[in-house]
Amino acid sequence: MAGVKALVALSFSGAIGLTFLMLGCALEDYGVYWPLFVLIFYVISPIPYFIAKRVTYDSDATSSACRELAYFFTTGIVVSAFGFPVILARVAVIKWGACGLVLAGNAVIFLTIQGFFLVFGRGDDFSWEQW
C-alpha cells in the first residue's frame, strides 16, 4: 500500500509542476509557448541514468566512471532546463513572470523525477525496473 501512496503523491506533484509550466505559457499576460521546450529536458534527463544502470554490472562498487559520467550528463541537462527560460526572458522572448512560473515548474518536476527514483529504485517487487 505504501507504493500506491507514493505513486499518487508523485502523480500529484507532477501535475502541479506541469500546471506551473502551462500557466507560464498560457496566461493572457504571457501567451508565448516557447517555454514548453523544457518538456524535452524532462524526457531526456533520466536517459543517462538508464544507460549507466544497464552498462554498469558491478553494483557493489562505490563509484564507477560510467555512473559518474551519467551523473555529469544528467546535471548538465537539469542545469540547461533551468537556464533555458532565463535566457528566453533575458532576450525578451518571454516575460520574467512566465520565467518564474517555468522555473517553479522545473523545480517541482525534477524533484518529482528524483522522488520517483528514490521510491521505486530499490529493486523490490513494485519498481520501475519492471517497466
Curated annotation (Swiss-Prot):
GO terms for cellular component: endosome; endosome membrane; Golgi apparatus; Golgi membrane. The keyword Transport does not apply. It is a multi-pass membrane protein. One of its GO terms (biological process) is negative regulation of receptor signaling pathway via JAK-STAT. It is found in: Golgi apparatus membrane; Endosome membrane. Induction: Down-regulated by insulin. Pfam families: Vps55 (PF04133). The keyword Flavoprotein does not apply. InterPro entries: Vps55/LEPROT. Its main location: Golgi. GO terms for molecular function: signaling receptor binding. Keywords: Endosome, Golgi apparatus, Membrane, Transmembrane, Transmembrane helix. The chain crosses the membrane at residues 7-27, 32-52, 69-89, 100-120. Belongs to the OB-RGRP/VPS55 family. Interacts with LEPR. Interacts with RAB13. Negatively regulates leptin receptor (LEPR) cell surface expression, and thus decreases response to leptin. Negatively regulates growth hormone (GH) receptor cell surface expression in liver. May play a role in liver resistance to GH during periods of reduced nutrient availability. This is Leptin receptor gene-related protein. It comes from Rattus norvegicus (Rat).
